[in-house]
Amino acid sequence: MKQQKPKISFIAAMLIVIGSSIGAGIFFKSSTVLENSQASLVLAIFNWLVASVAVIAMALALIEIASVRNDNLSIISWVKVFNRRWLYHGCKNFMTYLYLPLTFFFMPLYFICSIQDGFRGLLGLETGAHFNTSVDWLIWLALALIITTYFLTIPPLYAKVGNIQNMVVSAVKFIPLVFVPIIGFIVAGTGNGELKNVKALVQPPQINGATASFTQLVQAGYGITRFTGIGAGMGSFISIAAIFFAYDGFYVTAGLQSEMREPKKTPWALFLGLLITTLFYLILAVALSINGGLFSGMEESMGKLFNNKRAGQIVFGVVNLMIGIGVLGIINGFALWAPRFVEDLLAQGDLPFWKQVQGRLNPNKPVVGVIYCLVLSLTVQVLFTVIGALAYLPTVADYKNYVNTEIDKLNSMQWLYSFSDLMATWTSLFTFAFIACAIFGAIVNRKTKKITIANPKRYFLPAAWIAVVVNCISVFVTIIEPFINLFLLFGYDETVAHTVLGNDFIELNELVIGRVMLIVVLVFFAIISFLPVYVEDQYHKRKFGSLANYQQYVQQHLAHSTING
């Protein structure tokens, strides 16, 4: 039988890179980057450039790393090959028990948030569209569960449907990416935007029109990123970590080399694809930044531009619906992969119930993987929605318009959206931390040569070091920030905070809970990722005498299942 030739051309590969790395993430992170850059347009652009260089460097480094294994495990596989066993199991636990279900927790919520904005514009409402009940969160939960169930069943089991959905979404999601920069520059250029609130350079923080002192900022309860000097520096690296979220998914393309007609051109396809994505992001980031950082802030500005408030609302609504469709594209892409990586882990004996499903696994129709994903995702989705809507106190002011506070006294949707942001923050950070671990392990392997690299790349080491250094500093700064901010609350003065913040005043207990929760979730993620490794090892040592004996038992069982299958 003739061996099938790889079919992906250079242009097609470049388009795959662009399609997998560009998406709706920028609309959710642009304002965060501007805020952490202390409203400095120059610093915000610089942060986007540094993050983009780091992402391109990661992609180039991953070409060599991905060439070692050909499976559906992606990051998990790379960590397994180039790092220690405990780190592999930590990565596996994170991707299975946290990344997978939490993606189906907060991504449907981001879609719902976008359609609330969309219908707000289309219907001419003053606040986000809601059902005007005290249990709106339950109604939205029902929709979120339908989204998760659909995307975790139809696309994985009927790949053709998933591919068609990808094409449709790709066509739709590029419309906002082109339209928003154009309208953003026009709005700002005609004096209808928020350009006056954005400065070229970092400005010293102001309190009542005067430059604030360190003591005043501490007393008012500000976080470290609002401080002059060190605040801007830390804010830059936190911004870079946030920007990584906008590129999430680019690493899937690192395995393209084996599918290309001309494998030697893979680096150029990755480089040019990510470069085009970066240009899109930079232009869009500038357009959003000069209008306050959020597209939602442009609704009134577009009304002024068109000299028709209703026209501005309708355009705002249509674009937000398209952004929501872009979010569904992210869900669709992840849903195509998730059941397959779960089945690969089951096939290796690395997930619970692996013995019971041997002989039933099928990468083309991953029914077992689908069931596994549904049980995990739907359980977490319901549990975390209840916690977020009813028990999470700290709130993000931007979400106050997504619930009728006169009917829903708990502000449940504001709480829920704020809680989903908290989950998304650490989920993205852990993902890129594990990528950095895999790349660093590959750097070490260049010296030890424990893993044979068939085709070493000359550009690997410089790209790998850039990726690791930028990634590690960003992760480290993002981790220590909530600890510093919590410590700063010892200097909080309620009287000063009231005077400085006015209507934006936040109670001390809410500040404490918000900053403590960031740390609690970080610790929770670490425990869920790494504690099971220790517990399982102790159990297997006790039952089988040693880990080596257990691994031998697994291999014998898998071999027996293969023979019988």
From Swiss-Prot:
Q: Which domain of life is it from?
A: Bacteria
Asked whether the keyword Mitochondrion is assigned, the reply is no
Does the entry feature the keyword Cell membrane, yes or no? yes
Q: Where in the cell is it found?
A: Cell membrane
From the record, give the transmembrane residue ranges: 8-28, 43-63, 95-115, 137-157, 167-187, 227-247, 268-288, 314-334, 367-387, 424-444, 460-480, 482-502, 516-536
This protein's membrane topology, according to the annotation, is:
Multi-pass membrane protein
What is the name of this protein? Uncharacterized protein MPN_308
Q: Which organism is it from?
A: Mycoplasma pneumoniae (strain ATCC 29342 / M129 / Subtype 1)
